[in-house]
């Protein structure tokens, strides 16, 4: 049986925590930042936790992570 390919786009965007959940960085923090409030930019620095509904999809995309 052949190995399952890892989705490289997902592998670059998501990390798995010790408890088996996934986390990723927020969008909207790369450019055009002057119009965004300091509080909003500060909150975008935090990691975003993936919902349980989407975790199953990530498990299939990232079999060896």
Curated annotation (Swiss-Prot):
BP GO annotations: translation
SUPFAM superfamilies to which the protein is assigned, alphabetical: L35p-like (SSF143034)
Keyword terms of this UniProt record: Ribonucleoprotein, Ribosomal protein
Transmembrane segments: none
InterPro entries found in the cross-reference section: Ribosomal_bL35, Ribosomal_bL35-like, Ribosomal_bL35_CS, Ribosomal_bL35_sf
Chain residue ranges for the region called Disordered: 1-65
PROSITE patterns hit by this protein: RIBOSOMAL_L35
Source domain of life: Bacteria
Basic residues bias spans: 10-44
GO CC terms: cytosolic large ribosomal subunit
Family classification: Belongs to the bacterial ribosomal protein bL35 family.
Protein name (record): Large ribosomal subunit protein bL35
Annotated organism of origin: Xylella fastidiosa (strain Temecula1 / ATCC 700964)
Native organism taxonomy: Bacteria, Pseudomonadati, Pseudomonadota, Gammaproteobacteria, Lysobacterales
Gene behind this protein: rpmI
């Amino acid at each position: 049986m052949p190995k399952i390919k890892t989705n490289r786009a997902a592998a670059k965007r998501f990390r798995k925590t010790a408890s088996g959940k996934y986390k990723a960085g927020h969008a909207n923090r790369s450019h055009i930042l002057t119009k965004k409030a300091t509080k909003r930019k500060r909150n975008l620095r935090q990691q975003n936790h993936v919902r349980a509904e989407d975790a199953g999809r990530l498990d299939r995309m990232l079999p060896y992570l």
